[in-house]
Amino acid sequence: VRTDIVPAELGHRAFYKLLTATVVPRPIAWVSTVSADGVVNLAPHSFFTVACVDPPMIQFTSVGVKDSLRNVRATGEFVVCLAPEPLFEQINATGTDFPPDVDEFAAVGLTPEPSATVAPPRVAESPVAFECRLHQALELGDSTVVIGRVQRAAIDADAFDRDPAQGGLPRIEALRPLARLGRDQWSTIGEVREISRIRYEDWPGHYSPTARPSSNP
């Protein structure tokens, strides 16, 4: 039995809460920007994903006009840092609705690290930073999708399983990314499963999963 819900009947705020409680888990873009007056801003945004592969682009969504969006529009630059589990409380603290003249790095005790290609700093304590220049800010209703072209990725060397020039990739246990759920809930990476995608030429002609879902809640 399912409950059918019509967004307009429930109301936009209640349906927003429903969306964020069911579109889960959501990776977090920890976005660093600089205002036109030179004030550094840092804020978490949980509507975040890869937007394009070639050229490499990532995107985050600002619900309403917040300092991150205002600064990106003014300067055309931002940095997205990974939000790691050890910085859980500081990441949450940067979501406080500080006035625009407050530097969140200083407010929560984080270290700004100079970026190589843009003015906004990286979070030194974060294992991953993507330096971006604005490609497009797309307005959708009450929100704005900010798409940035990645100029440089800075990743802790000890996070890699081997030399990235030889195909090495960061180990998930070294990154320990946080994700947002509904309400005031967050999640850690938890159990990691690995399975290869089936090529059509290897398709057996029938399909039967080896592990069937439990009927218990």
What annotation goes with each model-predicted range?
Residues V1-P217:
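Basic, polyanion-binding surface patches
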